[in-house]
Amino acid sequence: MKNCERFANLALAGLTLAPLVVRVNPNLNVILTACITVYVGCFRSVKDTPPTETMSKEHAMRFPLVGSAMLLSLFLLFKFLSKDLVNAVLTAYFFVLGIVALSATLLPAIRRFLPNPWNDNLIVWRFPYFKSLEVEFTKSQVVAGIPGTFFCAWYAWKKHWLANNILGLSFCIQGIEMLSLGSFKTGAILLAGLFFYDIFWVFFTPVMVSVAKSFDAPIKLLFPTGDALRPYSMLGLGDIVIPGIFVALALRFDVSRRRQPQYFTSAFIGYAVGVILTIVVMNWFQAAQPALLYIVPAVIGFLASHCIWNGDIKPLLAFDESKTEEATTDESKTSEEVNKAHDE
């Protein structure tokens, strides 16, 4: 891990814990936390092998519709069912997800302090009555699961803002690390769709704000304000993950060309500008704002402007990680065939 990545991880940990001991300006906290989380997730997304699955254009076009259906369903559940019952079910669901996400987030750091057999040797566990079902894991994954279980139990018991944020940040980092848009065309379709999705549900209906306030699960980050009337500022995880996977794609584009992360820098600066604009407008109007309204144009605008300036629009639009994956697979098959022929 490079020094800047290590510093970013430490900065994110310190910023998350800081409100426990000192009063941190919530606006500054939102901006720094969002930006550092995207930075960490982006560099974790750079792998030696291309992603096994990428989002298609059809999936990107359907995403806002599926998101709208889920949002409206949650709104109706909270409206017609007991809020405590709905949150109890959601807490159980996120308990399992939280253990998996936090364990995966901590695993790279934990592996460095464990012996190699703990990291490499797989343990296969079969379900007692379903022999066909099996789970593979290593001892290091079990060790990483211990703090994951602790924080999930703490959140389920106390619903403390720190436990909420630790789980939320884990979801964000894993989302940016694991999700691949495949191409910038798909990314533009997704961001454009969610741009209008965010505007509609925040400005034209009470649904988004109502669900965010009622949904007692780590789908948003909470930043203590010290104000009894409004104890927390909130930032939805989607406002980090959705632009984050686009910024991560820009970083992997730079890496694929074996160049300095110039387009990543442009997209990342665009994200930071978008978050700052969101905070400024929110404080100016004293009302909830659809963050993607400001983040999406900033990210795409900064990246596109830089590409146009350098004359790199064509290679940017031609970049496709799914094709990279196919090429890598073909190369590995060819290599295997050559080795077999050599052995014969």
From Swiss-Prot:
Keyword terms, alphabetized: Endoplasmic reticulum, Hydrolase, Membrane, Protease, Transmembrane, Transmembrane helix
Name of the top EC class for this enzyme: hydrolase
Region (Disordered): 323-344
KO phenotype (gene knockout): Mostly lethal due to a male gametophytic defect.
GO BP annotations, alphabetical order: pollen development; pollen germination; proteolysis
Gene that encodes the chain: SPP
Subcellular locations according to the entry: Endoplasmic reticulum membrane
Protein name: Signal peptide peptidase
Pfam families noted in UniProt: Peptidase_A22B
Residue numbers covered by motif PAL: 290-292
EC numbers for this chain: 3.4.23.-
Gene Ontology CC, one term: endoplasmic reticulum membrane
UniProt entry tagged with the keyword Coiled coil: no
Topology in the lipid bilayer: Multi-pass membrane protein
